[in-house]
C-alpha cells in the first residue's frame, strides 16, 4: 500500500510505504537526500576547493558551482553530492553558518528541480495566421449572427 502521493499541492517523485519511517517522506519531499545546496559562496571558490572542504564529512561524488552563462562568473551558490545521506547530514550540521573562503555559507538539502512548464505560461509565437484561416473564421462568425 502506498502513502499519500500528493501532499500540500505538490506531487512526490516516489511514494513511501505506510510502514516506513517518517524520514522517507521528508527525504523525498526535500529532494535528493545526499545532495546539498551551498549558498553564499565566495566568487573565488572553485569546484575543487568546494569538494576538498566538504570531503572532511565523507565521500564527495560531485561538487558543482553554478556559473552565469553570459559572464562565465560564479553566481555564488552550488551543490555538493555525497555518497550517502548520512554524510550529507553530517556536512549540513558541520558547515551551515560557517566560513569558507571568507564568506559565511548556508547549507541545506537540495530541492528537486521544478519543471518550468514550457516557457512560463506564455504562448509560443508562430507568426501571422494564414489568410485562409482568417477568411474561414469571418465566414463562420457572419453565419452565426444571421
From Swiss-Prot:
Gene Ontology BP annotations: positive regulation of response to salt stress
Subcellular location, principal: plastid
SMART domains per record: RRM
Induction: Induced by methyl viologen.
Keyword rRNA-binding in annotation: no
Residues covered by the RRM domain: 34-112
Disulfide bridges in this chain: none
Residues with the Phosphoserine modification: 42
Keyword Transmembrane helix included in the entry's annotation: no
Domain of life of the native organism: Eukaryota
Observed phenotype of the null mutant: No visible phenotype under normal growth conditions, but mutant plants exhibit increased sensitivity to salt stress.
Subcellular location, record wording: Plastid, Chloroplast
Presequence range in chain numbering: 1-31
GO MF, any single term: RNA binding
One Pfam family per UniProt: RRM_1
GO CC annotation terms, alphabetical: chloroplast
Annotated tissue distribution: Expressed in rosette leaves, cauline leaves, stems and flowers.
Keyword tags: Chloroplast, Phosphoprotein, Plastid, RNA-binding, Stress response, Transit peptide
Function: Probable RNA-binding protein that may be involved in salt and oxidative stress tolerance.
Protein name: Small RNA-binding protein 11, chloroplastic
Native organism: Arabidopsis thaliana
Lineage of the species this protein comes from: Eukaryota, Viridiplantae, Streptophyta, Embryophyta, Tracheophyta
